[in-house]
């Protein structure tokens, strides 16, 4: 910028109100100059490491470990730093200490005869690791990541060289004193946490924190403690968000899925939702019903027969309520075009059959005591009272509401970040690969505008208070996001939940995937999507989750010549036999992209006691000779804008347009 160009002076005069506001922070020329120098220096630092994880499905142990080991980044750092100077078993032990410092300390202390020496060696090693992971950040940023109690000490250790002649005794003295006064344990724990924090600059969760796993609330607690992250909502997340907003249909779906997989710990223990009214209702109407199609799929859980039978009855009871509520929505919204999900009115109660789409099928279960054949979608008085109570429990769960507010505050349906497009499911397409349109309120939406519309409705469902009609419509759209054929989160032609429970003929169970999944290996499609979202065709990537990659069948997570990456995390144990692995995660550092495939995680206990890490194979997808700098990122764009404004402020000071405060 030419400082004394008259055109620039006019621009500065136009921005004078903003510049006066800026001058309250930078009072004079030296302070503005200092900040320009600082920001310009930051632009030249290597970009921070981004970590992409998807489809956690409530599996908190695997996820927590993945968060701690940063998909193998910490192990690779230890190899880079120590090479062959440390044996593999020592590096494994150090890695486990960094992941689980408090728990591992207790074990290591018991097995070391010379504890004082072990403390000193361990602290030296941890400081080396911390120096390495903090080297791409400014001192100011590192300082903010340090714990208050040990901030000064850790900063001194990070910024001094132990091998410098003049500082050897000073450095050693700090370490010796830490050990002598009994602070070594606390410092080891805090440095390990700092390493975990600095090794990844930004975490991206590409959907489905919730589902059948037992610890979604534990995962949410961990994410709320994370220093820098975002979430792209998944289909299961939307269901919980809808339930927390007050949608009865979403509430029924959440409970049905929880009962289907015998996962009541999140609902009852995590969020304090009382299911006794549902159990009482189920026993009253289905007490003598074996509910065979509703026996929970317990996977690795051990359930006694009485629990299994009770869950099956509760499962059936809430499923019937769900089908009724969904039928009411479909009839209320013909624009959703979901008439193919209206099945209760197709049942012939005399012979136990159902006729739809030109075929008649025998029902495997005809005990439907709460369905009125003349008005099948009407809730009974007791069903209505029950779903009201359950809705109230979700609305009044303090912890659930806290988690969902967080999900809204840092989440969205999609995200453009550093020239990459992140979304959970798909961009709905027609058979010819053109963007599919949805007509809402006599206006057509497709591509980006469709995702923006759904994002708007998702927020209105939770936050809108002024008009019940607006809020109710938005909540219905949340439910559509769960199961609608033009939903970017569902991505199938129809949800066949009723058919899977009540009809044995598997051809009725089929859910045809959106054409997006046929065309996503096409560079041409990816380029059209990039254009739709105004992204660089050469540099950008689409990063997806949702559909597990069946590696054992030869499927690849890298598609469209590297333009699209599928990273379903594979945390869900039910999918692991189908995929052959425990999924993929992605790392994007200053050199490029690293794709890691993972073996199943056994347990936190084994990780700590036996130092069993998640076995990962890493493939370098893109490796740049020139490291990407902060100036190449979204943050870099913001910093350049700040520098531009600060330079304007300098001119305003020098021209006397704004008075300096010396």
Swiss-Prot record:
Its EC number is 3.1.3.11. Pathway: Carbohydrate biosynthesis; gluconeogenesis. One of its GO terms (molecular function) is fructose 1,6-bisphosphate 1-phosphatase activity. Its cofactor is Mn(2+). The keyword Membrane does not apply. It catalyses: beta-D-fructose 1,6-bisphosphate + H2O = beta-D-fructose 6-phosphate + phosphate. InterPro entries: FBPtase_class3, Metallo-depent_PP-like. It holds the Pfam family FBPase_2. One of its GO terms (biological process) is gluconeogenesis. SUPFAM superfamilies: Metallo-dependent phosphatases. Keywords: Carbohydrate metabolism, Hydrolase, Manganese. Belongs to the FBPase class 3 family. This is Fructose-1,6-bisphosphatase class 3. It comes from Clostridium tetani (strain Massachusetts / E88). The lineage of its organism: Bacteria, Bacillati, Bacillota, Clostridia, Eubacteriales. The gene is fbp.
């Amino acid at each position: 910028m030419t400082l004394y160009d008259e055109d620039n002076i006019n621009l500065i005069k136009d921005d004078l109100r903003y510049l006066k506001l800026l001058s309250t922070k930078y009072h004079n020329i030296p302070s503005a100059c200092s900040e320009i120098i600082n920001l310009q220096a930051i632009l030249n630092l290597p970009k921070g490491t981004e970590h992409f994880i998807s489809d956690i499905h409530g599996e908190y142990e695997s996820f927590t470990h993945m968060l701690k080991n940063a998909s193998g980044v910490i192990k690779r750092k230890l190899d880079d730093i120590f090479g062959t100077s440390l044996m593999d078993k020592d590096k494994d032990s150090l890695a486990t200490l960094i992941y689980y410092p408090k728990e591992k300390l207790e074990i290591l202390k018991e097995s070391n005869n010379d504890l004082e020496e072990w403390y000193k060696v361990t602290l030296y090693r941890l400081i080396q690791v911390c120096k390495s992971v903090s080297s791409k950040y400014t001192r100011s940023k590192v300082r903010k990541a340090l714990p208050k109690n040990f901030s000064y000490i850790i900063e001194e250790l990070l910024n001094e060289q132990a091998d410098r002649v003049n500082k050897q005794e000073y450095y050693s003295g700090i370490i010796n004193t830490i050990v002598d006064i009994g602070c070594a344990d606390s410092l080891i724990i805090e440095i390990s946490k700092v390493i975990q924090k600095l090794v990844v600059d930004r975490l991206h969760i590409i959907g489905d924190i919730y589902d059948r796993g037992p610890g979604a609330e534990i995962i949410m607690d961990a994410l709320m403690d994370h220093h820098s992250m975002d979430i792209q909502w998944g289909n299961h997340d939307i269901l919980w968000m809808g339930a927390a907003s007050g949608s009865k249909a979403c509430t029924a779906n959440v409970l049905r899925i929880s009962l289907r997989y015998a996962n009541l710990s999140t609902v009852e223990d995590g969020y304090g939702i009382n299911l006794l009214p549902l159990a009482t209702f189920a026993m009253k109407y289905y007490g003598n019903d074996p509910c065979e199609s509703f026996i929970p799929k317990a996977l690795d859980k051990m359930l006694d027969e009485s629990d299994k039978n009770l869950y099956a009855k509760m499962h059936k009871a809430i499923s019937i309520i769900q089908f009724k509520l969904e039928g009411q929505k479909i009839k209320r919204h013909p624009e959703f075009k979901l008439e193919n999900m209206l099945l209760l009115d197709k049942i012939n109660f005399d012979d136990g059959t159902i006729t739809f789409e030109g075929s008649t099928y025998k029902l495997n279960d005809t005990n439907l005591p709460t369905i009125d054949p003349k008005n099948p979608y009407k809730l009974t008085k007791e069903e209505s009272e029950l779903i009201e109570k359950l809705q109230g429990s979700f609305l009044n769960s303090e912890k659930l509401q806290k988690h969902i507010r967080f999900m809204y505050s840092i989440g969205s349906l999609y995200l453009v970040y550093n020239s990459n497009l992140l979304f959970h499911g798909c961009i709905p397409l027609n058979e010819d690969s053109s963007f599919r349109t949805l007509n809402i309120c006599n206006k057509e939406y497709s591509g980006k505008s469709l995702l923006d519309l759904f994002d708007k409705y998702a927020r209105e469902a939770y936050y809108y208070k002024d008009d019940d009609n607006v809020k109710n419509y938005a909540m219905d759209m949340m439910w559509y996001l769960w199961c609608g054929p033009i939903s970017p989160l569902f991505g199938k032609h129809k949800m066949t939940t009723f058919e899977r429970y009540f009809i044995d003929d598997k051809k009725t169970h089929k859910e045809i995937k959106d054409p997006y999944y046929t065309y996503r290996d096409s560079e041409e499609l990816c380029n059209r999507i990039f254009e739709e979202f105004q992204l660089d065709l050469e540099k950008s990537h689409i990063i997806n989750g949702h559909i597990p990659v069946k590696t054992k069948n030869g499927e690849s997570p890298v598609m469209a010549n590297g333009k699209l990456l599928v990273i379903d995390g594979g945390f869900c144990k039910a999918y692991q036999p189908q995929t052959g692995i425990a999924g993929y995660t992605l790392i994007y550092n200053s050199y490029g992209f690293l794709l890691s495939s993972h073996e199943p995680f056994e347990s936190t206990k084994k990780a700590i006691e036996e130092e069993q890490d998640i076995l990962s194979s890493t493939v370098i997808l893109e490796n740049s000779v020139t490291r990407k700098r902060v100036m190449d990122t979204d943050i870099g764009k913001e910093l350049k804008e700040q520098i531009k404004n600060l330079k304007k402020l300098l001119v305003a000071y020098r021209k006397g347009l704004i008075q300096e405060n010396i």
